[in-house]
Amino acid sequence: MDIRIRTVTPEDLEQVAAVEEECFPEAEAAGKKDFERRIKTFPKSFLIAEKDGRIIGFINGCVTDETAICDEMYENESFHKEDGAYQSVFGLDVIPQERNQGVAEQLMKELIEQAREAGRKGMILTCKDRLIHYYEKFGYVNHGVSRSVHGNVVWYDMRLEFDEN
């Protein structure tokens, strides 16, 4: 499978919003305006997976000094600090027909590598309980139930700390 990972561009907005709609229930999905703001605010940490010229997935999140995601981060771009300590992951989306083929793994590994190269302390995300094990495979550690109540769902705080070598 020939997948190309690249940085988002403003022209990707429509396809990104469509992928999100396909991947998340309405209560949890980010809207087009959210993505417009994210693309403008932190394009370097918004990666796209493309196959045959079509977006099939993406990963995105701000860079912050926070050690866990809070709901305000999704709406308030002031949490983004270009030289922040932690790379967050707001969403890791892959369209259903392309899942279980390593696309999400490629996206996550690329963002982890990018965060390491930028000198970040680590990465943070929230996930549902059924995905804890998946993220642990990348080295994330479960820090318990999150303060986040985004979409009226129980989320778990996951953090990946980089070694300081």
Name the predicted role of every residue range:
Residues E21-A30, H133:
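Short, positively charged
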Residues K81-E82, I95-K109, A118, I132-H133, ...:
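Conserved glycine-rich acetyl-CoA-binding loop
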Residues V63-E66, T126, E136, V141-D157:
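Conserved catalytic-core motifs of GNAT/GCN5-like acyltransferases
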Residues F58-L92, R99, K109, V149-V154:
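Conserved acyl-donor/pantetheine-binding loop and adjacent beta-alpha core of acyl/acetyltransferases
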Residues M108, Q114-C127:
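Conserved GNAT acetyl-CoA-binding A-motif
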Residues D2-V16:
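A short beta-loop-alpha structural element at the N-terminal edge
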Residues V8, L92-V94:
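Hydrophobic adenine-recognition pocket in adenosine-nucleotide-binding enzymes
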Residues E26-I56, N60-F79:
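Active-site rim helix/loop that mediates acceptor-substrate recognition in acyltransferases
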